[in-house]
């Protein structure tokens, strides 16, 4: 995926910032007004590309909840491109704190050269500028890369727009047909990876992002873990261990993976060496231990266990030692997922009302709370919310959300994203019902 070449574009000096860095861990703040101006182009075809690039950049920034793209109908200045300084007063007049100018040109190699500059209209200074050289079919990725650069410059955190989501697509009609699908983080470029002839579950990205792993009941005998190469389309069986019900999660170095395997009435966490295929049992005793997830440094594993009667969350060293319970609230905990930043753990929590009805919740808690500290925070609830996963910058959580069947209308499942703060919940549009999302690392 190394098809995008960067060059720093510095046309004017940049010495200061009028805008304060956005703290995305705080509560809701007013989005920063930004104008994404029309991109200049050298041909009518590239004029269309430039228009589409502007749409993608604007949509990325809007979806983040941290920016307010101003409608082009409000623009006063008609000057475009990157050769001259903008008329900053005209942009301040429409309350644009930030301005993006850019251009699209075709190189002799056939590639596109997409350039942009981000301006601070208050200090009248360039904040960042770059040139990207990309194959014509990767213009959308270039737009995501530009949005990533803008997001990073203003928030101080890496962007997450040039990423992929792998998930389980479900037909709305009965019987449901499930297929593994792949899409851009915003729902674009949806592609089916399996044909729907067998039950598939829990797709996971390998560390390389060029491969995925998933569970399939293709033989109807037992669950098998499959590996699929996204470049070649080839797939193979990774393991044929009896008792597997979820795909593994991989260590940060990509050499090992953890999974749960049911044997003799108990379910335990095992680590597998991907080179030798050797298994090492990490938990013991009776009960059900599932949903392991590595810490970003690979030294710890979080998982859920009902060893004390009710499913709770536990952390242990990656060799199975030093087990410590970290959840103490009422309800049942499941599906822990460690933030890529290492600071938080996301989870699903099931609580019951006085009438016995269930409520599903997505929450976060500190990975390393102080003694007796209750760091748990619920960020969304519903009839069915589950399977949380993190954006690569650890500031957005994606999850599956379901609704019940009513009066001959079948229930539905969709994928949503929400900020770490619990604000800006939004649906990720998919062609069919969707569940079990997994977020990739930022693409190369």
From Swiss-Prot:
GO cellular component terms listed in the entry, alphabetical order: periplasmic space
Protein name (database record): Tol-Pal system protein TolB
Lineage of the organism: Bacteria, Pseudomonadati, Pseudomonadota, Alphaproteobacteria, Rickettsiales
Main localization, broad class: periplasm
Described purpose of this protein according to its UniProt entry: Part of the Tol-Pal system, which plays a role in outer membrane invagination during cell division and is important for maintaining outer membrane integrity.
Subcellular location: Periplasm
PANTHER family: PROTEIN TOLB, PROTEIN TOLB HOMOLOG
Superkingdom per UniProt: Bacteria
